């Protein structure tokens, strides 16, 4: 989990490309 990107109401952090990226739920 982390800061929610602009324009994203509900997000979950997932491991992608060796890093954690916010993905819209």
Curated annotation (Swiss-Prot):
Catalytic activity, as annotated: Hydrolysis of (1->4)-beta-linkages between N-acetylmuramic acid and N-acetyl-D-glucosamine residues in a peptidoglycan and between N-acetyl-D-glucosamine residues in chitodextrins
UniProt entry tagged with the keyword Hydrolase: yes
GO molecular function: lysozyme activity
Keyword Hydrolase carried by entry: yes
GO biological process, one term: killing of cells of another organism
Keywords, comma-separated and alphabetical: Antimicrobial, Bacteriolytic enzyme, Glycosidase, Hydrolase
EC number: 3.2.1.17
Domain named I-type lysozyme: residues: 1-25
Disulfide bonds: none
Family: Belongs to the glycosyl hydrolase 22 family. Type-I lysozyme subfamily.
This protein's name: Lysozyme
């Amino acid at each position: 989990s982390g800061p929610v990107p602009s324009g994203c109401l509900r997000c979950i952090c997932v491991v992608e490309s060796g890093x954690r990226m916010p993905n819209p739920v």
